[in-house]
Amino acid sequence: MTTAISDDLLGTAMVDFAAGRRSPLWLRVAPGRRLAHDLAAYFAPVTSHELALLDLAEGPVLDVGCGPARHARLLQTRGLTAIGLDRSLPAIDLARSLGLRRWLHADACSGPLPPARTALLLDGNLGLAGTPAGAAQLLHCLAMACGPGGRLLVSGRAPRHGRLRAMVIRDEYRDRAGPWERWLQAGLPAVLDLAAPAGWRLRYAATAGAEYWAALSLDTPW
């Protein structure tokens, strides 16, 4: 999930990157710090930590904030039904051009989601919810889609300080600046606290420095 189409600089930058038009995408963090946004990461091979996590997926799979859908497309090759979900139409179109077979151009909590067995919130995509309350709502929506025994695969990077970091950010690409938006960076303990009211329980976790990869399920043991 990214910004509205008229200001969808991330989606536009992804499309340009895939076509070989390599211009830097910047992430402006209020009140003024600017960071390079690594577009190559959206197209990188799946890592060993990600593979270990994706081995736990059961179909149908809902890939939330899929972007070019590198995880969903990998699961397709394993014979699983994988649905890419993104608010960015350019990202959805790009994922389709790269081979994604099923997609949904929508926000995860804007309406009923297709039934799923596994939901993906990888690459820190819980942050798309913007706030702790928004994250709790997103986790509830995914629990409703997955149902009893459903699985949630999450990865991200813990903040330098504390369990949660709420930020206001915007994308800057070429001569354009997107709208300011809320972003949430959550460490694994915070993710588990936010997920617990919806019934999600930790089943597997791995860490490497500040990065983490975790699998949760809805109450039913595996």
Show the residue positions of the predicted features.
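Conserved SAM-binding strand-loop segment of SAM-dependent methyltransferases
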Residues: 99-109
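Conserved SAM/SAH-binding beta-strand->alpha-helix loop
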Residues: 88-89
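A short SAM/SAH-binding and catalytic strip from SAM-dependent methyltransferases
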Residues: 116-135
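Conserved class I S-adenosyl-L-methionine
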Residues: 58-67
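S-adenosyl-L-methionine
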Residues: 1-56
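A short glycine-rich, Lys/Arg-flanked "PGG" loop and its adjoining helix->strand segment in the class I
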Residues: 135-148
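Conserved beta-strand signature within the Rossmann-like core of class I S-adenosyl-L-methionine
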Residues: 148-156
